[in-house]
């Protein structure tokens, strides 16, 4: 059984305003309406409940959950999905506006393999991740690239993976649904020119029914075929 908030009678004093416009629809950051210190406290309580109360395990004193110095723009990898019809929020549906079948480049709605929320700004990965995603979508829409339909298994554009490293290197891998060399080259050449900070530009052709690409051979289109996530100290 699932539910959603209809109205607030009285908000908890612990409730915080989410900083992401997609919070509550995107499943990526489920606790953003709690201050970070409270998130850590609740997560420590979850560990205690699952091991001691549910698991009946005798435990010593549980140390508090360790927090991160960064709560935004800390991820080094994000995978985005193309869809020929973007997910409409409840507010958009209830508003009755004629939005049409706009495409999406973003994240899956939790529990739905064929529904994708169009993301305007994600707070998980540092620049230039957002700019690369938005420019990719703009170029594809303006140049008539077809977006993936997971049920009908149609559309050229399937996925895009962006990796950023503390070294400053950026890897972009675009997954296409067909080996359309002309359109592949046009998009990748555009990204290379628009984002010179991309040090590794790759693509994969995936004609399978699922999105896994681990069994497919990536093509290094420009730059290196790898990035280094960490500097190794000589000492």
Which residues make up each language-model segment?
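Accessory RNA-recognition modules of RNA-modification enzymes
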Residues: 1-233
């Amino acid at each position: 059984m699932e539910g959603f908030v209809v109205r607030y009678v009285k908000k908890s004093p612990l409730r915080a305003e989410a900083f992401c416009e997609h919070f509550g629809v995107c499943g990526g950051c489920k606790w953003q309406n709690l201050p970070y210190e409270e998130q850590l406290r609740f997560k420590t309580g979850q560990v205690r409940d699952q091991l001691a109360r549910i698991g009946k395990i005798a435990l010593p004193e549980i140390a508090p959950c360790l927090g991160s110095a960064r709560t935004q723009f800390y991820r080094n990898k994000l995978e985005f999905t193309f869809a020929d019809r973007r997910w409409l929020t409840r507010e958009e549906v209830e508003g009755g506006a004629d939005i049409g079948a706009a495409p999406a480049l973003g994240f899956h709605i939790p529990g739905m393999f064929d529904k994708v929320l169009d993301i305007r700004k994600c707070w998980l990965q540092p620049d230039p991740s957002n700019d690369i995603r938005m420019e990719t979508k703009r170029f594809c829409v303006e140049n008539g690239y077809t977006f993936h339909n997971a049920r009908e298994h149609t559309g050229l554009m399937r996925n895009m993976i962006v990796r950023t490293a503390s070294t400053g290197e950026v890897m972009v891998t675009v997954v296409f649904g067909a080996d359309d060399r002309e359109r592949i080259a046009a998009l990748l050449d555009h990204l290379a020119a628009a984002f010179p900070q991309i040090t590794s530009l790759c693509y994969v052709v995936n004609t399978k029914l699922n999105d896994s690409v681990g069994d497919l051979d990536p093509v290094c289109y420009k730059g290196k075929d790898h990035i280094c996530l960490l500097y190794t100290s000589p000492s």
